[in-house]
Amino acid sequence: MNESVTELKDTTGNPAPLGLLGFGMTTVLLNLHNAGVYELNSMILAMGICYGGAAQIVAGIMEWRKGNTFATTAFLSYGLFWLSLVTLIVLAKLGWAAAPNDTAMAAYLAMWGLFTAVMFVGTLRLNVALQVVFGSLTILFFLLAIGDFIGAGPGFRHFTGYEGIFCGFSAIYAGLAQVLNEVYGKVVLPLGQVKQ
């Protein structure tokens, strides 16, 4: 009796750049607000829903399909973070729920900081670019939490915004580096591979 073996090959694209770009671009735009460049507006909320939220969720589901636990957890979690942040803002603006006070927001942001700090440990086995993204994001969440907890003034909030802009651009770099490196079949923008 002849037995045939069929081998299935994964031919789907790399979803990580989509997730990193969704996170990075939305983070830059929100932190331009935090840095005092412009007021909170519908552009930031729309980016939070669509690119920061939905695009990262799509990337997370695609990473799940590829069996990548780290990326699945990261993209789904941060996609849902963006949706929850927009929901917090919109519910209060519509008068459907009370806005969280500074202590509540500090707790919310600190929990995300703790989660991100643990995820940062995972990047120590991946690459330097992701270490920069997750390291700077950990700092950003804790700065935001501290700012809300102590009722920080504009100077502290603007400084935090600049740190967030750096974090967002580091994610944009990591995402675009993966795209260009794949397209050219060589290292165009280095990610700083970690020796295992």
Short names for language-model regions:
Residues 72, 80-107:
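Helix-adjacent hinge/juxtasegments
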Residues 69-78, 129-136:
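Cytoplasmic-side transmembrane-helix entry/capping segments in multi-pass membrane proteins
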Residues 185-196:
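Short, highly charged, low-complexity non-transmembrane loops/tails of multi-pass membrane proteins
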Residues 56-66, 118-125:
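C-terminal ends of transmembrane helices
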Residues 107-118, 128-149, 156-177:
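Alpha-helical membrane segments in multi-pass integral membrane proteins
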Residues 1-59, 63:
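N-terminal topogenic module of multi-pass integral membrane proteins
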Residues 40-53, 99-111, 134, 161-165:
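Structural signature of hydrophobic alpha-helical transmembrane segments
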Residues 7-14, 36-43, 65-69, 96-103, ...:
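Juxtamembrane loop-transmembrane helix junctions in multi-pass integral membrane proteins
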